[in-house]
């Protein structure tokens, strides 16, 4: 997309059907009039001006007639163009938060730079892994602007390389074809003195679960001399923290995915951590060990997202309840359970109620002593709470 062809006054104008009563950057299709008259056909993903029925200014942003989210407002300032300077300002602001305020460079060379709406760039996520920027697109318009975004990122880190992608369901919803480059070979990042091999382009997010950084460190504080069970261990983050920084006596990691277990074993070796990894379905494995009465002092349960569909939330909660019940039965009396959900459609209140139900079914008591979310490089706006998706609940199981 050429950002220099049209001034802001020459952009297509999209009119709303009703008065806008929210500052949320999303405007849904049902609220938007179809382009007509002088506006003519408006290309999906292009930048448009947005006005109310009476012509009152709303903002400027990305338009997509095929998406449920028809408009993503990027600025409410009538005199602010969506150009390279705009992206430079937004990315610099985000960089200042991560480096000057949060000072993440003291802790890691891998962090989230752009967290979509929270950083003023709806439809875009940017993660940094050492010298590689990984861009994930949730809006066709952001995908079409990727060259501009990359050029700004190169201003921050001139020696960087890039990988970008959009998940299949996003491409379908947004009606665009995201052509990703060849993924880079796995490489190393560091976090809190530990090393991890990351693989952007693998099927598990952008390469590593950056959102759990603070929770990994927090969990390790409870592991000294303990036996630890890491369910849905993925590439090994929680278990490796528990064994190295936490000085756990014994760590067992369970995951069904052979690919991520290979990565977990490599990460354990990088950090000289002796960890037992088992490829298994957690439901089957936990049911199999139950008759023996085997328990662990610390259990982590961090499954992948269970649903993207509002109609399936109740089903997801039932699955969470079943796996939490089994996990609680594997916790030694007085032990610790860290149970997590990255399913944004499941509210914190509903997740906590699920934990209550699971404890009752397991014949245990769950004493919640801390509730956390994503790491601080995943901020959220109070008027766009979708960015606050992760629930990490620390419980003592009695």
Where are these regions (language model features)?
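Rossmann-like S-adenosyl-L-methionine
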Residues: 181-398
């Amino acid at each position: 997309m050429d950002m220099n062809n049209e001034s802001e006054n020459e952009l297509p104008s999209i009119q709303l059907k009703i008065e806008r009563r929210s500052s949320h950057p999303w405007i849904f299709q049902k609220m938007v009039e179809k382009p007509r008259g002088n506006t003519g056909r408006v290309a999906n993903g292009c930048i448009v001006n947005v006005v109310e029925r009476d012509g009152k200014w709303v903002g400027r942003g990305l338009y997509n007639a095929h998406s449920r989210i028809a408009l993503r407002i990027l600025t409410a300032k009538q005199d602010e163009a969506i150009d390279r300077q705009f992206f430079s300002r937004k990315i610099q602001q985000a960089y200042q938060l991560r480096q000057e305020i949060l000072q993440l460079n003291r802790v890691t060379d891998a962090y989230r730079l752009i967290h979509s709406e929270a950083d003023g760039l709806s439809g875009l996520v940017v993660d940094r892994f050492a010298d590689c920027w990984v861009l994930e697109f949730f809006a066709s318009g952001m995908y079409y602007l990727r060259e501009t975004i990359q050029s700004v990122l190169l201003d921050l880190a001139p020696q960087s390389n890039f990988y970008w992608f959009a998940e299949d369901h996003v491409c379908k919803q947004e009606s665009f074809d995201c052509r990703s480059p060849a993924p880079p070979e796995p490489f190393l990042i560091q976090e809190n003195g530990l090393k991890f091999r990351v693989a952007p382009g693998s099927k598990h997010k952008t390469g590593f679960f950056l959102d759990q950084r603070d929770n990994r460190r927090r969990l390790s504080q409870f592991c000294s001399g303990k036996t630890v069970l890491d369910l849905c261990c993925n590439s090994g983050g929680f278990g490796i923290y528990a064994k190295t920084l936490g000085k756990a006596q014994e760590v067992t990691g369970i995951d069904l995915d052979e690919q991520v277990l290979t990565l977990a074993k490599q990460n354990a070796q990088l950090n000289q951590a002796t960890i037992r990894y088992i490829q298994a379905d957690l439901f089957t494995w936990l049911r199999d060990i139950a008759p023996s009465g085997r328990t662990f002092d610390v259990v982590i349960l961090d499954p992948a997202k269970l649903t993207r569909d509002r109609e399936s939330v109740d089903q997801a909660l039932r699955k969470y309840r079943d796996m939490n019940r089994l996990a609680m039965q594997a916790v030694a009396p007085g032990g610790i359970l860290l149970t997590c959900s990255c399913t944004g459609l499941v509210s914190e209140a509903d997740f906590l109620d699920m934990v209550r139900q699971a404890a009752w079914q397991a014949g245990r008591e769950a004493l919640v002593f801390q509730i956390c979310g994503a790491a601080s490089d995943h901020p959220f706006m109070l008027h766009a709470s979708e960015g606050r998706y992760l629930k990490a609940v620390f419980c003592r199981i009695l």
